[in-house]
Amino acid sequence: MAGRSDWDYTRNGPSTWVERFPMAAGSRQSPVNIETDRAESDHEALSSKPLRWKYPASASRKLVNPGYCWRIDCDGEGTLLTGGPLMDDIYKLEQYHCHWGCSDSRGSEHTVDGQAFAGELHLVHWNTTKYRTFAEAAKAPDGLAVLGVFLKVGKAHEEMDKIARMLPYVSHKDEMIEIDDPIDPSKLLPVRGGRAGRCINPCMRWADRIIRPDNKCGFQDDNGYWTYLGSLTTPPCNESVTWVLFKKYIEVSHHQLNIFRNLRKFPRGEECPCHENHGVVINNFRPPLPLGNRVLRECGSF
């Protein structure tokens, strides 16, 4: 993977990444703008192989500040993502992290009909059916799967608050802390078990009763998502990701986002690079790129 000195979101920002990482100029790059009127309905695939996941809270092991976001690393044991666009392949949770802006109006990487959100949570998985390691999977076109969740400012999110309370302990780059109070990734999803917001499209109709526990495989969701083939949104921008973006968002508070914005992009003891947003981690999102001739599918009822 690339060294952090090779890229950032300011002087060495997204518009320059292609100079060091040629894959960033590929035709399967992420994020994209979700044009809802362009999405192809795929209700049959959803009903035949629903998207399913299982996330034991014990899998979340440590909170890390890599200098450009907060990230929770997982051991993957007992985790599972399958179904939907992933078909029968089994994916394991590797880590999850977040993107946000300097204000509550913009911070997501993907947009929906041009609308940005306050932030975007990414749960990154790798294909254990076909590949032996995350590194191997990251080089394959079907190696990774990322669940994307939009964040909107509203009420404080209880599970997200566990993360926010720990962030002062990893305030500077390269700091990390073991997680003592278990964090359940499934409670960060906009389905039953987490705090769900409204639908992004106000014309959509939803019913929590159709989201039900599945005894064999955690939760399964009929509640709606968009999916397309894309890439990692950070260098080296490998084109290895099947994206699943939930149509619902979760609410987080303004205070919680402000705690995110207090993270520092430089190590403790080093001089603050004050030419770069006073050294704080903000606007850590890549702008949307063309979808091109890729197929955007939607699963879920309107």
Predicted regions and their residues:
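Alpha-carbonic anhydrase
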Residues: 1-302
